[in-house]
């Protein structure tokens, strides 16, 4: 594990260009390095999971030496028993020249209903009725606005704070904070691939039918309660729609767009995305979820819960259901339900274990993460104090001299190589 504590902010920089730190609420957050493809990002997300597991093992070894024993649990989920929520944030780079407001507004209907294809599932007790039921999304009950600059108290679906973490004259960041933390890699790939396709379409000026909800927050909660995708919500333009209808329209539009889009290295994954997207909608509409029972988190978890309820003759209010809901998100191999199911081939895996192991210490070669990762590695090897964030690198011994990383796609230059070789 090649990690370094940076300054006094409790931020740890990884040699693969990623970041581990304590977020609001003192829970650990792992932020992956910049990636330029879905497959690359899947690999680095998985590398982050394995890094967290390794740190937990180290912590348990330290506890055994100093306190006798102790177990460290790491849950990759979005809510706790006290009603707090922590997000799985997605950051998409878009052109500054595009109309950010137009794209954000057009994206809202897709994001409100996206939980139907990539929700993590949640056993939830309704505080108003006292009834406990199964919902599509963990995050849906914890957002309170459609589009705003807030991130915590009044969480929006899309955060509009203009912090591109890149050349602000060229880029903006589409900061989506409504998503659930996915466990199954196909769910993650569908979440990312579908959103990327829709963003590409919107940047190209391709408009989709107007499904903007009359109240996005009311709509997102209605959708979360409707496992069949058929729960109607009001539209701003009048009438009603459903998650199934909205996702069908977006999926069809994305498929048509992909037919005319120039072929590149992303094309195979995008075709795979359209396939799983359609299969998921078909399965939900038919009521037979078997075709996606190894791919979509909320479906996998629901199957586990249904078997447990049938075995014990209980409903969702039984504490064992809440426990199962939680431990599905335990990332620790040998203990967590998800790692066990995946290891037995009961959940599909997309990443290559060899590539994941490499990604734990080696940054992507195609983004500025390569520069940051090489800088961190050099400093760790040399025992040199340093400071590094998403857009700046500097040695502690010469804080007035720093390198700016404003181009996310610049992976190395001769000038930066010279800077890195300098030991401060």
Task: State each model region's role.
Residues 28-30, 174-177, 393:
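Generic recognition of long tandem-repeat/solenoid scaffolds
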Residues 223-424:
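Sequence termini and other peripheral, non-core segments
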Residues 70-82, 86-239:
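Loop-rich catalytic cores of soluble enzymes, especially ATP-dependent carboxylate-amine ligases
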Residues 1-7, 11-12:
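Single conserved hydrophobic/aromatic residue that forms the stacking wall/gate
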Residues 13-72:
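Signature for HUH/AEP ssDNA processing cores
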Residues 11, 33-35, 58, 118, ...:
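Generic recognition of cysteine residues
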Residues 1, 16, 132:
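Glycine-rich, flexible loop/turn motifs
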Residues 41-46, 189-198, 277:
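Short, Φ-rich (hydrophobic/aromatic) sequence segments
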């Amino acid at each position: 594990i090649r990690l370094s504590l940076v300054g006094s902010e409790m931020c740890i920089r990884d040699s693969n260009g990623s970041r581990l730190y304590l977020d609001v609420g003192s829970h650990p957050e792992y932020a992956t390095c910049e990636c330029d493809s879905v497959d690359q990002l899947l690999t680095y997300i998985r590398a982050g999971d394995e890094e967290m597991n390794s740190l937990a093992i180290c912590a348990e070894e330290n506890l055994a030496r100093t306190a006798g024993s102790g177990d460290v649990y790491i849950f990759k989920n979005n809510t706790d028993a006290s009603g707090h929520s922590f997000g799985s944030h997605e950051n998409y780079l878009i052109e500054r020249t595009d109309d950010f407001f137009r794209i954000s507004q057009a994206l809202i209907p897709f994001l409100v209903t996206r939980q139907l294809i990539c929700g993590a599932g949640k056993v939830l007790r309704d505080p108003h009725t006292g009834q406990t039921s199964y919902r599509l999304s963990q995050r849906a009950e914890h957002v309170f606005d459609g589009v705003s600059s807030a991130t915590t108290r009044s969480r929006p679906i899309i955060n509009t704070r203009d912090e591109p973490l890149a050349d602000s004259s060229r880029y903006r960041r589409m900061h989506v904070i409504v998503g659930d933390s996915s466990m199954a890699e196909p769910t993650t790939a569908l979440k990312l691939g579908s959103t990327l396709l829709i963003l590409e379409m919107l940047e190209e000026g391709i408009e989709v039918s107007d499904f903007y909800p009359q109240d996005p927050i009311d709509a997102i909660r209605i959708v979360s309660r409707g496992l069949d995708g058929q729960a109607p919500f009001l539209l701003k333009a009048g009438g009603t729609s459903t998650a199934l209808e909205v996702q069908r329209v977006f999926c069809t539009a994305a498929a048509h767009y992909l037919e005319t889009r120039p072929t590149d290295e992303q094309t195979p994954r995008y075709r795979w995305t359209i396939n799983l997207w359609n299969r998921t909608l078909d399965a939900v509409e038919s009521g037979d979820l078997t075709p996606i029972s190894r791919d979509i988190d909320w479906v996998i978890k629901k199957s586990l819960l249904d078997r447990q309820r049938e075995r014990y003759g209980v409903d969702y209010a039984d504490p064992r259901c809440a426990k199962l809901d939680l431990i599905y998100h335990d990332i620790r191999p040998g203990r967590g339900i998800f790692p066990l199911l995946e290891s037995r081939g009961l959940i599909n895996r997309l990443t290559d274990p060899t590539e994941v192991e490499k990604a734990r210490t080696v940054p992507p070669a195609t983004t500025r993460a390569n520069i940051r990762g090489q800088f961190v590695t050099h400093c760790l090897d040399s025992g040199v104090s340093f400071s590094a964030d998403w857009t700046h690198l500097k040695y502690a011994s010469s804080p007035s001299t720093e390198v700016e990383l404003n181009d996310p796609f610049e992976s190395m230059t001769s000038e930066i190589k010279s800077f890195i070789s300098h030991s401060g």
